[in-house]
A protein has these predicted regions:
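Iron-sulfur-cluster electron-transfer modules
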Residues: 18, 24-27, 44, 56-227, ...
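Ferredoxin-type iron-sulfur electron-transfer modules in oxidoreductases and energy-metabolism complexes
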Residues: 3-24, 45-72, 76-78, 86-120, ...
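Hydrophobic scaffolds flanking metal-cofactor catalytic centers in soluble metalloenzymes
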Residues: 29-35, 39-60, 67-68, 164, ...
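Cys/His-rich zinc-coordinating "finger/knuckle" motifs
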Residues: 37-43, 47-48, 80-86, 90, ...
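Cofactor-cradling patches in redox/metallo enzymes
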Residues: 159-249, 280-297, 302-396
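The −1 position to Zn-ligating cysteines in a subset of zinc-ribbon hairpins
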Residues: 29-32, 36-39, 72, 78-82, ...
Length: 396
């Protein structure tokens, strides 16, 4: 009788040392409760789950078996939100990816993304000379610290992706309506480095961050406002970020303008909207109220919350470098999200992230949610007739 085949686990102390170094020691903090696996959105779709606890355990033991799983992670942070030991699991995953680069265990095509960044300054492989083509006809000035209070950082997706370009143009309309003096870097705008960081190539990201820090210092920018939450998050990982310049997502700036009574909205016909919180605002930066403050200020808008909202948001599936990897239709979180949004009876599914917009529009199409329109908050603000508020007696 043949004995059953069993997996033999060979512990590798040398590899464990490299795991510790790559994850800055955080991989050792996991004590295997399994909460991470239970809350991972991969458990909601047809494909195999990541098995986060298993990845962490194999990493702790220095054994193989985690390489494929770490590339499925969207770094959404759902696991971290519920981890009783507060292990920074997303950072551990990025650390393991950095080790995978060293061991050349990287999915096909990802090195090409980084080479596009190296040669063309963007992960889309588009020419730098076309970076500001999205702004044709808008007459946006080149940023000048003596004239402008805000440097608008557009980002690669909003610069090159056709749908993202519409978002960038809407943000420009919002800033102009609010009376904000701003400029951009035009074709000189560099990639923030998000793809390098999210794909785990830490050394390349550090070089990008250093070069960009020098460039922004030379521009004498004191406030940088981003179109994408991913760019916003990436800038916060630059060394000395708070000392050099302030960085905000555009929704945070608009929230402050609304709260200060500096902008108002003409309003819309009575409309139900629901909001999808981007992971890189809601979980990574605890920012959930800014968009709701803005929408609540628009006459005619009624906010219908989805069950999974704010810090409990469901990832769209586009983070953690997954925008550059293929996901089977049955494994796309955004399809479930679109169905959830349609179930609220809302006419508009609003969000504040170009990656989320791309995934959710695809999800709405697959889900057959024909009556649900996906739009960015800046587009809703323009639709609602944003403008500078009329001065009150107290402000005259």
């Amino acid at each position: 009788m043949t004995a059953p085949t069993r997996e033999v686990l060979l512990l590798d102390d040398d590899r464990w040392d490299r795991v510790l170094l790559a994850t800055k020691g955080e991989a050792a903090a996991c004590y295997q409760c399994g909460t991470c696996t239970a809350t991972c959105p991969w458990g909601l779709v047809a494909g195999p789950s990541i098995g986060v606890r298993s990845v962490m355990r194999r990493a702790q033991l220095g054994i193989d078996g985690w390489a494929e799983a770490v590339w499925r992670c969207t770094t959404c942070g759902a696991c971290e939100e519920h981890c009783p030991h507060e292990v920074p699991i997303s950072d551990v995953m990025l650390g393991l990816r950095s080790l995978a680069w060293e061991e050349r265990s990287v999915p096909q095509g990802l090195s090409g993304v980084l080479w596009d960044m190296h040669w063309d300054g963007n992960p889309w492989g588009r020419p730098p000379s076309a970076r500001s083509a999205w702004a044709n006809g808008l007459d946006i000035p080149r940023f000048d610290a003596t004239k402008h209070s805000v440097l608008l950082y557009v980002g690669c997706t909003a610069s090159y992706d056709r749908r993202g370009q519409k978002i960038a143009r809407a943000v420009v309309s919002v800033l102009r309506a609010a009376g904000i003096s701003f400029g951009t870097l035009g074709d000189e705008e560099p990639c923030c480095g998000d793809p390098a960081r999210s794909l785990g190539n830490e050394e390349y990201f550090k070089r990008i961050a250093q070069a960009n820090s020098h460039k922004l210092a030379a521009e004498r920018a004191t406030e940088v406002v981003t179109v994408s939450p991913h760019c916003y998050d990436t800038f916060t990982h630059y060394p000395g970020i708070g000392e050099a310049f302030r960085v905000r997502h555009y929704s945070q700036l608009l929230r402050d303008l609304v709260a200060e009574g500096k902008v108002s909205f003409a309003g819309v016909e009575p409309t139900k909207v629901t909001f999808h919180d981007p992971c890189y605002l809601a979980r990574h930066h605890d920012e959930t109220e800014a968009p709701r403050t803005i929408m609540a200020a628009i006459p005619g808008v009624s906010i219908e919350e989805m069950e999974r909202s704010r810090e409990e948001t469901l990832c769209c599936g586009g983070g953690g470098g997954r925008m550059w990897m293929e996901t089977l239709p049955e494994d796309r979180f955004a399809t479930s999200r679109a169905r959830e949004a349609a179930g609220t009876g809302a006419s508009y599914l609003v969000t504040t992230c170009p990656h989320c917009i791309s995934c959710l529009e695809d999800g709405a199409s697959v889900a057959g949610a024909r009556n649900l329109k996906v739009m960015d908050l800046a587009e809703l603000a323009v639709l609602a007739g944003i403008g500078a508020a009329a001065p009150t007696e107290a402000s005259r």
